[in-house]
């Protein structure tokens, strides 16, 4: 992959995360943290939906040539997100709090309104 392709993909990902934050806020989610990183993984968005802590993975694509965006949340990726979520919960002393894993899939076709699919409870805690 060329460096400009990587930069374009990073920019697309950042745009997708900004779109997802606006989408979630519009649905009364409280954004707690963005881009939480630890040695075992990363969580794009951590939010609250009422009393539930929601760990959100955002996937953005320009087209579906390689399948829908959510298809890239593989079992391996789910394990990484789960480990990062457990780390975050432990750091905040919230291991007993209700939590779930959502995916926000965004298709950002050229010059078009983004197509957003919010998949609640997209996967279970994975080890």
UniProtKB/Swiss-Prot annotation:
Membrane-spanning residues: none
Stored SUPFAM superfamilies: Restriction endonuclease-like
Positions of disulphide bridges: none
Pfam families assigned to the protein according to its UniProt record, in alphabetical order: UPF0102
Molecular function GO labels: nucleic acid binding
Family indicated by similarity: Belongs to the UPF0102 family.
Name of protein: UPF0102 protein Gura_3756
Provenance organism: Geotalea uraniireducens (strain Rf4) (Geobacter uraniireducens)
């Amino acid at each position: 992959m060329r460096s400009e392709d990587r930069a374009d993909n990073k920019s697309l990902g950042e745009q997708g995360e900004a779109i997802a934050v606006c989408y979630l806020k519009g649905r009364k989610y409280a954004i707690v943290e963005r881009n939480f990183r630890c040695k075992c993984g990363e969580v794009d968005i951590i939010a609250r939906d009422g009393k539930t802590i929601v760990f959100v993975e955002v996937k953005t694509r320009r087209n579906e040539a390689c399948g829908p965006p959510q298809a890239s949340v593989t079992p391996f990726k789910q394990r990484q997100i789960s480990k990062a979520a457990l780390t975050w919960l432990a750091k905040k002393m919230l291991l007993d709090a209700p939590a779930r894993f959502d995916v926000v899939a965004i298709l950002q076709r050229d010059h078009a309104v983004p197509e957003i699919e919010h998949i609640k409870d997209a996967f279970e805690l994975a080890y």
